[in-house]
Regions:
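Conserved AdoMet/S-adenosylmethionine-binding subsite of the radical SAM
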Residues: 1-127
């Protein structure tokens, strides 16, 4: 992570809060988070090896660059028990259609634990 979040995570945990962090996965994550989401970015979808077993979910934004081969590569990198979530880019119709096609094709090929979820902050227009 680019920001130094360890002091914040420690302070929140001391006060009894649970901590969820979403990261692109290119750097290690602070110790003590309760839920880690990894959202790797194209074109390489690089993820630090130490995060692979810690991630509770993996999110892929369905961009124009996202391919079925990339979905397969990311799915193979993480444990089957870790959900891989396809998220359409905002409310863009092309991205929703592409996300659905990727989900259906992944299902046809028997790739496990792949889901579809909207980016709620985009739907609600929260910046």
């Amino acid at each position: 992570m680019l920001q130094e979040t360890r002091p914040l995570v420690r302070a929140l945990r001391r006060e009894g809060f649970r901590v969820q962090v979403e990261t692109n996965g290119t750097r290690e994550c602070p110790v003590g988070v309760d839920w880690l989401t990894v959202s790797p970015k194209p074109p390489r979808f690089a993820v630090q090896p130490g995060l692979v077993g810690k991630a509770r979910e993996v999110k892929l934004v369905v961009s124009r660059e996202l391919t079925l081969a990339a979905v397969r590569a990311v799915r193979r990198r993480f444990p089957v028990s870790t959900p891989l979530i396809l998220q359409p880019h905002g409310m863009a119709a092309w991205s929703m259609k592409k996300a659905w096609r990727l989900l259906v094709e992944a299902g046809r090929r028997g790739w496990p634990n792949i889901r579809l979820m909207v980016q709620l902050h985009k739907v609600l227009k929260i910046k």
